[in-house]
From Swiss-Prot:
Annotated source species: Nitrobacter hamburgensis (strain DSM 10229 / NCIMB 13809 / X14)
Function: Protein S19 forms a complex with S13 that binds strongly to the 16S ribosomal RNA.
Protein name: Small ribosomal subunit protein uS19
GO MF: rRNA binding; structural constituent of ribosome
Gene Ontology biological process: ribosomal small subunit assembly; translation
């Protein structure tokens, strides 16, 4: 379900402060965030965020196509190791 337009996008307050500080300083360090639910805004383009996936911070470099999506979409929380193979097919 999509968020109401009149409410506007959700962004964690601390995330905005960190992004503004990174822009002002001009440093290109990874900004560590835990807020996977925050929406990516146009002012985040060009910055690199470390989005926490429950295990580690996955580096996400924000570009224009990501605007409007959530940070959590770009940091998978589960790893797929594949299905087990058919043992009969391997022997033949």
């Amino acid at each position: 379900m999509v968020r109401s337009v009149w409410k506007g996008p959700f962004v964690e307050g601390s995330l905005l402060k960190k992004a503004d500080a990174a822009r002002a300083s001009g440093r290109h360090d990874v900004i560590k965030i835990w807020s996977r639910r925050s929406t990516i805004l146009p002012q985040f383009v060009g910055l690199v965020f470390g989005v926490y996936n429950g295990h580690k911070h996955v580096p996400v470099s924000v570009n224009e196509e990501m605007v409007g999506h959530k940070f959590g979409e770009f940091s998978p929380t589960r790893t797929f190791h594949g299905h087990s193979g058919d043992k009969k097919a391997k022997r033949a």
